[in-house]
């Protein structure tokens, strides 16, 4: 355990950030899973709607600093290819 006051504060803020980041990543996985299930069921409308929602969540994660912009771009590209293949 840290003895320095600023380090004690950093431990608390890092834990808050870790929990927040894990929650955002979990939402992303759920959104991408929704796109994949819609693609598997060959439902174009549901897949398109899920793609929009997932893209929005990926962009939000980038703006919050949870994901790198290239990582989000790769994920969006992958799910877009699946939806466009329908």
Swiss-Prot record:
One of its GO terms (cellular component) is cytosol. GO terms for molecular function: small ribosomal subunit rRNA binding; structural constituent of ribosome. Keywords: Ribonucleoprotein, Ribosomal protein, RNA-binding, rRNA-binding. One of its GO terms (biological process) is translation. The keyword rRNA-binding applies. Coiled coil: none annotated. Gene3D superfamilies: Ribosomal protein S20. The keyword DNA repair does not apply. InterPro entries: Ribosomal_bS20 (IPR002583), Ribosomal_bS20_sf (IPR036510). It comes from the Bacteria. NCBIfam families: S20. Binds directly to 16S ribosomal RNA. Belongs to the bacterial ribosomal protein bS20 family. This is Small ribosomal subunit protein bS20. It comes from Arthrobacter sp. (strain FB24). The lineage of its organism: Bacteria, Bacillati, Actinomycetota, Actinomycetes, Micrococcales.
């Amino acid at each position: 355990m840290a003895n320095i006051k600023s380090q004690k504060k950093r431990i608390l803020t890092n834990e808050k950030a870790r929990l927040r980041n894990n929650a955002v990543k979990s939402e992303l996985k759920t959104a991408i899973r929704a796109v994949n299930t819609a693609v598997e069921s060959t439902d174009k409308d549901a897949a398109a709607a899920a793609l929009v929602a997932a893209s929005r969540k990926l962009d939000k994660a980038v703006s919050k600093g949870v994901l790198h912009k290239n990582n989000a771009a790769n994920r969006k590209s992958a799910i877009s290819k699946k939806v466009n293949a329908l």
